[in-house]
Amino acid sequence: MKSYTRLYLLLILFISVAFVFDQSTPTFEASDEAWHYGVLREIAAGRGLPVQRVGELTTYRQEGSQPPLYYYIGAALISWIDDYDSLSRYSYNPFGQVGVPGTTENVNMFRHTNLEEFPLTGVTLAVHVLRWFSILLGCGTVALTFFVAEALFPENGNLPIL
């Protein structure tokens, strides 16, 4: 019987780093997170997949044209959450310097309020549930990559951990 201690340690490391990222990144500040949430909100509200229209500014922007499987699963996961504060969360930081190399001040795209503090409610709770779902998917990717490397290079026991 094979020992999967190295895989377990790798998954623990992955989950630890992902959890630190989850807790240290404000709501909607991860890459395109606000727009992905906009797609999920459309589906969870029963409006189906968003329709892309040229020149129309929406809460989902270009993400409305992405493949829908993740969005359908994510919408099901957050459908029970009352996102009463969703539209107010799209409040841009007028002084934000997003994408400016070397910036150390005003690095956030959105304004952040005490709605992001514990206990988690509304949009913040929904975003964290989705992040945890993404971490679970990431664990599957790490494990699958480990097994593929192990199958392709059975003589090199350390390669799958890379």
Name each model feature, range by range.
Residues 5-8, 98, 104-121, 145-162:
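Transmembrane-helix signature of polytopic, membrane-embedded enzymes
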Residues 4-34, 41-60, 80-88:
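Transmembrane signal-anchor helices characteristic of membrane glycosylation enzymes that use polyprenol
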